């Protein structure tokens, strides 16, 4: 979709830990809900290049966790610092969504909860006709030093 909207731009989808670009090539990296590959990000970003790192906010999918677990938990919110980067901004975006039954399994499969939820929790989720849940995204902006 992005390539169609801005055909003059260049896009790549790859492993965070082995990106198919030359050293110092990127002006901007976007890393959504993926591991922080610090060495690779430092390699591919030009000096002064920026990275937007998207992590879950405290209440992200909290109501889903309330279905899955006996004791649901909030995501930890912490200040994050990485060598070689300066934190230059942060914004949190929150909302509430209603996920119909047909899309619940796909959403569940995109989360780390899919791999560690007891069978009973997964069965409770699968039995729902829909799920109304909070979403919360933290956009952390860093600049390469």
Question: What is each of the regions a protein language model found here?
Answer:
Residues 58, 65-87, 93-145:
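Conserved Class I S-adenosyl-L-methionine
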Residues 17-29:
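A short acidic, Gly/Pro-enriched loop at the edge of an enzyme's catalytic core
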Residues 12, 88-91:
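General small-molecule cofactor/ligand-binding pocket signal
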